[in-house]
Swiss-Prot record:
Residues 4-248 form the CN hydrolase domain. The active site is at E43, K112, C153. The keyword Cytoplasm applies. PANTHER family: NITRILASE-RELATED, OMEGA-AMIDASE NIT2. Keywords: Cytoplasm, Hydrolase. It catalyses: 2-oxoglutaramate + H2O = 2-oxoglutarate + NH4(+); 2-oxosuccinamate + H2O = oxaloacetate + NH4(+). The lineage of its organism: Eukaryota, Metazoa, Chordata, Craniata, Vertebrata. One of its GO terms (biological process) is glutamine metabolic process. GO terms for cellular component: mitochondrion. Its EC number is 3.5.1.3. It comes from Xenopus laevis (African clawed frog). This is Omega-amidase NIT2-A. CDD domains: nit. The keyword ATP-binding does not apply. The gene is nit2a.
Amino acid sequence: MAKFKLSLVQFLVSPVKSDNLNRACKLIKEAAQKGAQIVALPECFNSPYGTTYFPEYAEKIPGESTELLSQVAKECGIYLIGGSIPEEDCGKLYNTCAVFGPDGTLLVKHRKIHLFDIDVPGKIRFQESETLSPGDSFSVFDTPYCKVGVGICYDIRFAELAQIYANKGCQLLVYPGAFNMTTGPAHWELLQRARALDNQVYVATASPARDEKASYVAWGHSTIVSPWGEVVAKAGSEETVLSAEIDLQYLAEIREQIPIRRQRRRDLYNVEEKRN
């Protein structure tokens, strides 16, 4: 299939987990009814984002949130990239994205590889490593449309991860994310366009809607970028479902016109995975 519809659910996350789950499911169903074949939720879609919240909202996988995602994916017959939730496993906490197929099967579980530890004086300091542990595996899943690679938020800053996914045959990279009011306006779109252009892939980011009253204010602006580096769809800061057509024939044409994949000097340099 040369084309398919991707939808990103950007919704306002509240402190009430049940409200978040109900809202997410409602918007997922709306996207599916309008023809979406792959749907993605934002980072930390079931809980507020913050180191104090992660232990409070953490769940096992399978658990309440992921079981609900499995059910709605099966009900709608879609591929569902379940944003991320705080996951508890063997006494450790992870920022984890669970992906489900049209039959409700768990296809992949991506634990955020690169933890969000930054300190911009006078603007923002955040240390995910105060409560979270990093993941240590790549996350790729197959669909009838194309192969998809998954990262979470800060993972997008690392060009190597995107290149490894592209080398594995991914044509779409999806990053549930929650950039903030400092890094969002400066880097959010830039990083997406860079990853798309570098690897000649589609890149999509699903953000929570902006809540000015939250302790951590998300930038919003969920986005879909083409392999030409062009923004094909971009949300504002409010709650919405953003959709775009992913055109794999267009991707193939770009790769043929500018054949960087064949032109790389692997005799001089290479990016490779250390663990499978």
